[in-house]
């Protein structure tokens, strides 16, 4: 059935009484669940109109399918004739599947009784709302939101009905902006006032908003205000006074930014703006009223004087007895945590700003301290989430992103980096003032960090709580108690794009980035984020559509043959490569070339001699599913270790691969995964993470023959070094020092157990007499605690200021050497059967790690520079350009898997891809044209070669490459 709208209307017929036409627009989906093996979905939406009481379906329509995305944009409108009192709309999101049944992605059930009515005189007749997708049953795995616009078409009954509808709508979370309101020209929605203390907003399983009063444990549909809860003022005053006293008790104020937003509890949809009063007098007016949104165009710009008067009228600033006198405007994220807090001395103009120009001047800011009278006007700062206070992210007419600093009315192309400095602890409340930290704008030339949180050590280290914490940490090294040297701070999830707490990145005069550790007051060239292995970093693969705008001065054009190229108007050059993919944060860290290591390695290889009276090769035939035990029996059965120096020849059962180097690299890779698996009890994770390994001191309890297995592992490590292969493992630094026979120092413990290190360092810098420590250690094994003397009769010798250095040395010796001495001796026994230990000692502990395990990070630029092409391919061939683009868009883990797919190992030689070895010596990575576009790529690991078919599109190449890397296993032919 069609109407004057020119669109079909579903549902009831026109002669039905009390019916209205509902316009429904399915706008988009947000962060839907992944159903595809490639991390995407093909979503569409089914709209079902049904009678609520009878569960009878009246109409069913469906949107189009959006391919390969988790954030689809449909923008499709439908019209329904409904009875608002007893009809409902069910929105179901599905992932289209051509082979099997479509996967369920979530649903939203919406009642129709409280929807707004359109006003034809308004510029924006109705607004959208994000609905949390709900599961259909407890087995459903859904996530994300569905963005909808729903409003009734106006009747001919006049304006009274509309006004009545609007008043009713405002009570249920929908907002209809009045056309006569001055804020109707704004692009932002007018936010509701904040909830009273003790109230919480939630959404039920039907998508309806309700409010919970935690003070008297009741719920209601109506949004409360401070006027509604005046009868409970005594409880509110007592509760907020307790919170204010708690804040004044704290030695300083912590301002931090969440590293990863979390979904809000109960499915709450993030609200726009709210006013939070920081330590204000409850007797005064503390209700934060909603501020007007910024103007939509230059024509509707509000003058600073008018905005100042409006803010002065709406914000009630009442000083309390302590002189803490202001309210801070913040933006509440889904995690409902404090992001930034700012009070400036001028009103920021919210008008439309021109595209970026050079930043001019520094933002003016003021510090409000106790006893000072603040200015009557408080700046309304429009802040984009994740940016410093007063900064906003916008896009120009060409889609390029720029940043607006409303504090000093400037624009810039560079994303601001917020530096949050925390003051030292202080015992008095008068020193716990709030300070404004100005954002610093830098142009990072390496891995950038949007946020740096500086954690200063606590003052007053001689306080009794600190001493107790040190003593507890020393008495029980496995104690989870936090270190007394770091100030309390929110526990964030590890996110690769952020530096660790207390670190900062700066640029040296020569353009090289360096890193400052404010915790230890040291600097280093090494990025602290790269201490995490690639499989522990959380940065996901990039989408070509999410790269953002081109850098300033760049232009994208289409060639006559349909290929995209890029013009740099700054240097007047053209290139095929996308400049956005050349960011060091995407390409990976540069390979730190070491000439000294190269010379040592060449000398080391010359001194290794192969005995003359051994067979031509050492053969092993193994099963993949039992590689550990079969390798152990085969290698330990060799009575003469020199036989292992013959050429390795590995065969996997039921595979036809010929080992010319590639199968052996695969064997070392798979065997490393098994040998170093803590499940077998030979190794364990260090105290601070779950990827760095150390010898398990209790390995004898797990395996009676554990020393024989350590000898086997030593032989495998010696085999790898002798034959130029790499192990896949991460060991603590003291492990390599023990191999070299070097003394382990206190600094070596910092990266292994930071809490234990901080405790020992405190003892070194202070008098430990009052701690009542003895020369003994409490060791816990399987729930039982044992006391171990560090020296004869150590439990009777007290640690004093005179003998504390001896105590620290004995603790380190016990922690790293004494407990695992037998295991390390067995490991070195097997290792030195193939390599003389004196020859190994020409390397230091860092170089020994690189010799045995190589580099864990992939520098794509270095990989690309040391690659060759055959059979019609060249560096500028479209398929080659697509291949490297696909590699750049991969996350670090997928690059490692690709490297393992084409070379047989997941590690890179010390000096990069220039030193890749094949079956007959150095062999650069090679890409050769082969096959037809219907086939998957194939690899020859012995020659470091990838056979790549001439695919017709980038999407096809990327899909086939990922499929080959993630699903291929086994050898056939020469490898």
UniProtKB/Swiss-Prot annotation:
Activity regulation, free text: Activated by NDFIP1- and NDFIP2-binding.
GO BP terms in the entry: monoatomic ion transmembrane transport; negative regulation of potassium ion export across plasma membrane; negative regulation of potassium ion transmembrane transport; negative regulation of protein localization to cell surface; negative regulation of sodium ion import across plasma membrane; negative regulation of sodium ion transmembrane transport; neuromuscular junction development; neuron projection development
Compartment annotation: Cytoplasm; Golgi apparatus; Endosome, Multivesicular body
EC number: 2.3.2.26, 2.3.2.36
InterPro entries hit by this protein: C2_dom, C2_domain_sf, E3_ub_ligase_SMURF1, E3_ubiq-protein_ligase, HECT_dom, Hect_E3_ubiquitin_ligase, WW_dom, WW_dom_sf
Pathway: Protein modification; protein ubiquitination
Domain WW: 193-226, 385-418, 497-530, 548-581
Effect of residue 942 to S: Abolishes activity. No effect on USP36 protein levels
Enzyme category, top tier: transferase
Residues spanning the membrane: none
Active site, UniProt feature: 942
Molecular-function GO term, any one: transmembrane transporter binding
Tissue specificity as recorded in UniProt: Ubiquitously expressed, with highest levels in prostate, pancreas, and kidney. Expressed in melanocytes.
Record domain C2: where: 4-126
HECT domain location: 640-974
SMART domains: C2, HECTc, WW
Residues that bear Phosphothreonine: 318, 367
Residue numbers carrying Phosphoserine: 312, 342, 446, 448-449, 464, 475, 479, 483, 487
Role according to the record: E3 ubiquitin-protein ligase that mediates the polyubiquitination of lysine and cysteine residues on target proteins and is thereby implicated in the regulation of various signaling pathways including autophagy, innate immunity or DNA repair. Inhibits TGF-beta signaling by triggering SMAD2 and TGFBR1 ubiquitination and proteasome-dependent degradation. Downregulates autophagy and cell growth by ubiquitinating and reducing cellular ULK1 or ASCT2 levels.
Domain remarks in the Swiss-Prot or TrEMBL record: WW domains are involved in recognizing PPxY motifs in substrate proteins.
The protein, known as: E3 ubiquitin-protein ligase NEDD4-like
Lineage of producing organism: Eukaryota, Metazoa, Chordata, Craniata, Vertebrata
